[in-house]
């Protein structure tokens, strides 16, 4: 069989760099199309589109796509979501104070909207490639 390891090295981190790396690396899905056409794999291993966004509570407000300054003061970090609306990773750090249930619900809703927007862009790019 074939093993594919996808690695993203972040040379200079700033705000949502980690989440951007996760989303950008998904573009390697094009590799699987090529392997399918060449008969090297029988089935596309990609189970779902996914994307990652940074989010956090800054100054009592839920924010999406944090810059470095916001990220350094935020109460939460990131969400990786799927096309079907599932969450494959959620990082929360209540470093300055705990995140409330209301804030968490608001962050998840905000993040899912951001993930859906990124996935729509991924689909468009992959369809045009």
Regions found by a protein language model. Give the residues of each.
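Polyanion-binding surfaces on beta-sheet-dominated domains and ring/shell assemblies
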Residues: 1-129
